[in-house]
UniProtKB/Swiss-Prot annotation:
UniProt keyword list: ATP-binding, Cytoplasm, Kinase, NAD, NADP, Nucleotide-binding, Transferase
Name this protein carries in UniProt: NAD kinase
HAMAP family in alphabetical order: NAD_kinase
InterPro entries for this protein: ATP-NAD_kinase_N (IPR017438), ATP-NAD_kinase_PpnK-typ_C (IPR017437), NAD/diacylglycerol_kinase_sf (IPR016064), NADK (IPR002504)
GO cellular component: cytoplasm
Disulfide bond annotation, renumbered to this chain: none
Protein role: Involved in the regulation of the intracellular balance of NAD and NADP, and is a key enzyme in the biosynthesis of NADP. Catalyzes specifically the phosphorylation on 2'-hydroxyl of the adenosine moiety of NAD to yield NADP.
Catalyzed reactions: NAD(+) + ATP = ADP + NADP(+) + H(+)
Name of the encoding gene: nadK
GO biological process assignments: NAD metabolic process; NADP biosynthetic process
Amino acid sequence: MAAQRYILVVAHTGRRDSLAAGVSVCRQLLAAGVVPVLSEGERRDLLAAEPELATVVALGAEVPPAELELVIVLGGDGTILRAAELVRGCPAPLLGVNLGHVGFLAESERDDLETAVARGLAKDYEVEERMTLSARVKVGEEVVYESWALNEATVEKANRERVLEVVIEADGRPMSSFGCDGVVMSTPTGSTAYSFSAGGPVVWPGVAALLLVPLSAHALFSRPLVVDADSSLAVELLEGAGGEGVLWCDGRRAFDLPRGARVVVRRSPIPVRLARLHPGPFTDRLVRKFTLPVTGWRGPDGRD
């Protein structure tokens, strides 16, 4: 007898379009003999809308994350980041169907939902691993907080009226100090997110690197930096100067930073796994997602 298959469905069930998509996906999974799994809250929302889907089970209470085969994510990049948090450290890849705006991490659009689910059921996808960050906060010699991020760990000022006074470091060595609104430390995946909005470079996801991008720095040397993926980056809030800060990991997990706190970011050994239906050059994804103008391109001339 074949083992029971479990697929997690992550949807923003507070939105009508996302809830409807979640209902559609659950029906398609059940028709294929696969058990849909949802978080407790999203399962309640789903059953309130469609009581006949009572065979849908709850994540954790009935099915542990380690038993999941796949995660189907219905929404934009924020929903994908939430899904990555739910299954952190588990082998199940994330298959994103964009219901948001840019949806840079998503693999398909709403019109292709049924086809995307069918390919997920058939295991007709490739798995791409994306690097993540580990973030550690130290006050003196004490580690007071630890977290992780797929996109970025950002140190921001806690008070709009006070700038942050920081020292930035690479590989345990001081590089510069300045006043700023914050500092973004990013993965290549995050280079098209907050880092990009702050003026950082786009880094191809296959590049092993970390990025550091100052936010509105009052300094002559405040350029974005790209360092080796095995380097460490750190931001230290100067004692007795500037305001207090907040560490945000992927814009989801926050920790208040007192003056003197030091945030150290390194490459995490735990990647996020993405299910890819359309493998191809990252350039094509960049052009498609950002609707970049390429009119007039005549193709390689044979001399490349």
